[in-house]
């Protein structure tokens, strides 16, 4: 009986370790998709950007015009890939190319991640599509402009 319990414990422990390793593997793959997206942008590498995206991707930002009207700015996967190929973030100095990726949640074939970039923050929804993690939605927002210190007046 004791041997049976020990065997059961070993099998149960091994399955828990396997599940944890799989989740870590998914987290690594999600992080890689996010890095393909942001590093592809900074490097103007359209192929890398395209690899990170689902073809039906929607990238959106909430904008407010000067009259206070709200608008939803949108970009498709192909529009983003084309813009990446044309210029991307090549004009952003290397030292400003922030790319902090955090995987926020994974459940089945769905995941959420956050990228803190040079002047903006991206919230990504990813899906495990045909065995690969790809970005299907991006909601982004510009970081606030840095506050400048008030100038002192000289007399």
Predicted regions and their residues:
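Short beta-strand edge/turn micro-motifs at domain boundaries
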Residues: 112, 122-147
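Surface-exposed, charged secondary-structure patches
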Residues: 22, 62-63, 71-120
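Residue-level detector of flexible, active-site-proximal loop/helix-junction positions
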Residues: 11, 64, 142
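Short, low-complexity N-terminal intrinsically disordered segments enriched in polar/charged residues
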Residues: 18-47, 51, 55, 149-154
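Bacterial N-terminal signal peptides
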Residues: 6-16
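Positively charged n-region of N-terminal signal peptides that target proteins for export
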Residues: 1-4
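A mature extracytoplasmic/lumenal domain signature
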Residues: 53-55, 63, 117-119, 128-130, ...
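N-terminal, post-signal-peptide region of Sec/Tat-exported proteins
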Residues: 42-82
